[in-house]
């Protein structure tokens, strides 16, 4: 095992169009097989669709959607005396963002629209209105944490 200390997190550069690091992270998560150009077309195409359909600034819709998707609590399995408990824990800001983006894309990919940009746009608009699969995932996670509140004293 290496003993040279912790390696710092690599910082992503803000995207050229909206100057946002979160959009860059979204693009990087959309990307498959290193095809960043395709991922950018999907992301910016989705933002254009949002602008046409809602006549709002796409970044506002995106930020609202992300706030509605990102979880505050999650459960972590902890084994104590032969029993496994689901212990609710708070989610760190970095992980909140990562989970939000991941859930957004999983929900988008499962949708029925023909093109990914349409699916992503629809899921973002749904999430901004507090509906959709990604928001449901967050609600389920929060319900799970609420149901296991009794085990909160087993925190890490």
UniProtKB/Swiss-Prot annotation:
- Tell me where on the tree of life, at the top rank, the source sits: Bacteria
State any GO CC term: small ribosomal subunit
One Gene Ontology term of the biological-process aspect is: translation
Q: Which Gene3D superfamilies does this one have? A: Ribosomal protein S7 domain
Output the PROSITE patterns linked to this UniProt entry.
RIBOSOMAL_S7 (PS00052)
Q: Which CDD domains match?
A: uS7_Bacteria (cd14869)
Q: Which UniProt keywords apply?
A: Ribonucleoprotein, Ribosomal protein, RNA-binding, rRNA-binding, tRNA-binding
**Pfam families named in the record:** Ribosomal_S7 (PF00177)
Q: Which family does it belong to?
A: Belongs to the universal ribosomal protein uS7 family.
Described function: One of the primary rRNA binding proteins, it binds directly to 16S rRNA where it nucleates assembly of the head domain of the 30S subunit. Is located at the subunit interface close to the decoding center, probably blocks exit of the E-site tRNA.
Q: What is this protein called?
A: Small ribosomal subunit protein uS7
What species does this protein belong to? Clostridium kluyveri (strain ATCC 8527 / DSM 555 / NBRC 12016 / NCIMB 10680 / K1)
